[in-house]
């Protein structure tokens, strides 16, 4: 009669105890109050005014100090545990501010963040809080936008690591019906009648840098301009003759697809941030 050692019975039992302890510890961590974690790890953050719930599910009141009156809103999240298999924290997120509503998935890794399937609308009131322009009362529609941004590992990263930082993946569209835009510059307001346009997002590599490319086109798929954002949050703007022909004070002449304005500025400054 075969003899079965008692140690062979103990090993599976120990394994189950270990797995049980791991799941219990994970459950305990997920039930930790989000307010306590914020107080412990980011006590002086200016961006979060109130937080409730826990890591699994909760909500927060946020503000972004872009002007004398900060942009405020709310965010709700629901944790998606299967992203841990990829070494990331992932959650379903709803973001709102006045009439702005966005829904999508947010994933955060040790040196990257990712947005997937973000859709909704950005209200004109929200845009007016961010940029010092006169804008038409029409929202920007966000259609299935996905972004993946890689960060340099640390401030002393090599030049190759810094070049690797930036946008590795991008897709989706922004659409806008357009209208009259007033752009202040040099104490004067310049008016431009924006046509209905579509902004198509993609990731491109230029000069060994990973860039987010925003291709601006009209309803006839004609080119209006290009925006590029790099890993250092620098914005490159290129506008074509076709777009500037909608500005009454513009008298330049060139083939319509020719870029006639090119500007490079920090991201928020380039958007006319308050």
Language-model segments: residues:
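N-terminal Lys/Arg-rich, disordered targeting/topogenic segments
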Residues: 1-12
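Hydrophobic membrane-insertion alpha-helices, especially the h-region
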Residues: 10-33
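Alpha-helical transmembrane signal-anchor/signal-peptide segments
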Residues: 33-53
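N-terminal beta-strand/beta-hairpin edge segment
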Residues: 46-133, 138-145
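Beta-propeller and related beta-repeat scaffolds in trafficking/envelope systems
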Residues: 75-84, 167, 171-211, 249-273
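Short, hydrophobic/proline-enriched secondary-structure or compact coil segments at domain edges
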Residues: 89-93, 112-120, 172-175, 212-216, ...
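Non-cytosolic head/periplasmic domains of membrane-anchored proteins
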Residues: 102-198
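Extracytoplasmic/luminal low-complexity segments enriched in Pro/Gly and acidic/polar residues
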Residues: 213-274
């Amino acid at each position: 009669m075969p003899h079965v050692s008692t140690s062979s019975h103990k090993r599976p039992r120990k394994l189950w105890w270990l797995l049980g302890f791991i799941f219990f510890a994970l459950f305990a961590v997920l039930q930790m109050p989000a307010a306590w974690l914020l107080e412990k790890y980011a006590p002086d953050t200016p961006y979060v005014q109130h937080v409730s719930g826990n890591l699994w599910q909760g909500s927060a009141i946020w503000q972004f100090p872009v002007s004398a009156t900060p942009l405020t809103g709310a965010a709700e999240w629901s944790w998606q545990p299967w992203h841990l298999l990829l070494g990331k924290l992932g959650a379903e997120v709803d973001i709102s501010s006045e009439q702005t509503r966005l829904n999508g998935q947010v994933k955060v890794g040790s040196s990257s963040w990712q947005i997937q399937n973000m859709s909704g609308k950005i209200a004109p009131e929200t845009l007016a809080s961010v940029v010092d322009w006169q804008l038409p009362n029409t929202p920007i529609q966000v259609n299935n936008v996905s972004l993946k941004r890689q960060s340099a590992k640390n401030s002393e990263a090599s030049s190759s690591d810094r070049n690797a930082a930036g946008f590795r993946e991008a897709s989706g569209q922004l659409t806008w019906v357009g209208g009259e835009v007033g752009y202040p510059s040099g104490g004067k307001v310049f008016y431009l009648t924006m046509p209905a346009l579509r902004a198509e997002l993609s990731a491109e590599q230029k000069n060994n840098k990973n860039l987010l490319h925003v291709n601006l086109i009209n309803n006839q798929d004609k080119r209006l301009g290009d925006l590029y954002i790099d890993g250092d949050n620098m914005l490159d703007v290129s506008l074509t003759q076709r777009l500037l022909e909608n500005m009454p004070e513009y008298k330049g002449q060139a083939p319509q697809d020719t870029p006639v304005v090119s500007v490079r500025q920090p991201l928020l400054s380039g958007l006319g941030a308050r």
